[in-house]
């Protein structure tokens, strides 16, 4: 059950990855770098908390 948030965050990261059909930027576009940083830090926090209790749940990453 602890792994569910980790998988949800991974799915969100995959869904927000740039694609070949990317639209050109407009002045209303928001840069995605802060969103990626927040998701990365949330994933690291969940991974650390999860790995302390369930070693099989650990996600390997940099």
Swiss-Prot record:
Keywords: Amidation, Disulfide bond, Secreted, Signal, Toxin
Classification via Pfam families: Chi-conotoxin (PF16981)
Mod. after translation: Contains 2 disulfide bonds that can be either 'C1-C3, C2-C4' or 'C1-C4, C2-C3', since these disulfide connectivities have been observed for conotoxins with cysteine framework V (for examples, see AC P0DQQ7 and AC P81755).
Positions where Glutamine amide occurs in the chain: 60
GO cellular component, one term: extracellular region
Tissue: Expressed by the venom duct.
Compartment list: Secreted
Entry keyword Protease: no
GO molecular function per UniProt: toxin activity
UniProt signal peptide: 1-22
Pro-sequence residue ranges: 23-49
Domain of life: Eukaryota
Domain statement: The cysteine framework is V (CC-CC).
Family of this protein: Belongs to the conotoxin T superfamily.
UniProt-recorded name of the protein: Conotoxin Tx5.1
Species, as recorded: Conus textile
Lineage of producing organism: Eukaryota, Metazoa, Spiralia, Lophotrochozoa, Mollusca
């Amino acid at each position: 059950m602890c792994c569910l948030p980790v998988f949800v965050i991974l799915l969100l990261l995959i869904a927000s990855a740039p694609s070949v059909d990317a639209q050109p930027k407009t002045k209303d576009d928001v840069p995605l770098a802060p969103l990626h940083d927040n998701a990365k830090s949330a994933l690291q926090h969940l991974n650390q908390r999860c790995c302390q209790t369930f070693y099989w749940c650990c996600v390997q990453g940099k």
